[in-house]
UniProtKB/Swiss-Prot annotation:
Gene source species: Pseudoalteromonas translucida (strain TAC 125)
Enzyme Commission number(s) of this protein: 2.1.1.-, 2.1.1.35
Keywords: Methyltransferase, S-adenosyl-L-methionine, Transferase, tRNA processing
Single GO molecular function: rRNA binding
HAMAP family xref list: RNA_methyltr_TrmA
Catalytic residues, chain numbering: 323, 357
InterPro entries, per database record: MeTrfase_TrmA_AS, MeTrfase_TrmA_CS, SAM-dependent_MTases_sf, TrmA_MeTrfase, U5_MeTrfase_fam
Gene designation per UniProt: trmA
Main function: Dual-specificity methyltransferase that catalyzes the formation of 5-methyluridine at position 54 (m5U54) in all tRNAs, and that of position 341 (m5U341) in tmRNA (transfer-mRNA).
Gene Ontology CC entries for this record: cytosol
Family: Belongs to the class I-like SAM-binding methyltransferase superfamily. RNA M5U methyltransferase family. TrmA subfamily.
Gene Ontology biological process terms in this record: tRNA methylation
Reaction catalysed by this enzyme: uridine(54) in tRNA + S-adenosyl-L-methionine = 5-methyluridine(54) in tRNA + S-adenosyl-L-homocysteine + H(+); uridine(341) in tmRNA + S-adenosyl-L-methionine = 5-methyluridine(341) in tmRNA + S-adenosyl-L-homocysteine + H(+)
Protein name as it appears in the record: tRNA/tmRNA (uracil-C(5))-methyltransferase
Amino acid sequence: MAVIKIDTSQYDAQLSEKEQRIAAQFQRFGVDKLEVFSSEPINYRQRAEFRVWHDGDDLFHIMFDQQTKDKIRVDSFDPAAPLVGEVMQVMIDNLKSCEILRRKLFQIDYLSTLSGEILVSLLYHKPLDEHWLSEINTLKEKLSSKYKIDFIGRARKQKEMLGDDYVTERLNVNGQELIYQQVENSFTQPNAKVNIKMLEWAQDLCKPLKNDLLELYCGNGNFSIALAGSFNKVLATEISKSSVHSAQYNIAQNKVDNLDIIRMSSEEFTQAMNGERSFSRLEGIDLNSYNCQTILVDPPRAGMDTLTCDLVANYESIIYISCNPETLERDLDHLTRTHEVKRFAIFDQFPYTHHIESGVFLQKKNT
């Protein structure tokens, strides 16, 4: 069932259930104690996506029940950050009265930040012409008196930008402000306050670690930028072109001078490290100049393939960030042949759902 209305009195119970479930699932890896990081019980999501339903003169957001596929009208959305919730209502009020903006509109996406920016993407089953551009400009001017708001219009083979296609998040991590560009249609952690807790936990892990860090699946540099100060050098890989572009932007904004990002998949990087293939994308980067004793991986829900697990197992210390306990368990079966779990944390990125974000710290066994 989609989470729309929230009874905050149930928050502690649902988190306790997750803690017990994960503790039981990973007990065989010697996990004695979980570190548990809670979320805000309401208004925690910085992004939200809705379909749009037209009913005569009426117009409203909808979601679909995951089991029955029935549509659910969404006039207010309790998980949404306050800025998203407020702008949702403002958008509906303004779209209802504008035929040009509402016609053939089928989806609205919201992306916001703790620092007060919001990007609204409007998706259409029609080409966007000069009349649409005129109306959306008028709306942007009207709303900009109160909000730091930009718009994107999307139609088939068409993208119109009214402002930027990204927001700039500013996170206070252990007293340091970190700046992150977050681009429309690119992955970012939806629960910004829990993301801060994840970054602070990772920084704590890295305090005693030395030499260099390798990160696979680095996204927009979320972890590597926060951890760069703990290491001599950081090398990070990411396959998404837009995420690599954002990571480079974020490196410059945060004045990080010891971090290199290369655009390649974990499988390709494994081939490069094993000397199986050479890549022009590695030109100017001497892999042998890095003394990486720590590796951080934050893979997609599918986890890591066997060859990547083999590569990861070569490092003294492993930080594994996971959004899927099932593939994490599978990969730990592989990694605990050579390493032992030292710390295990859960982060409630997605309250009131079965989803859970985990962080595991492993160190090589003494032989």
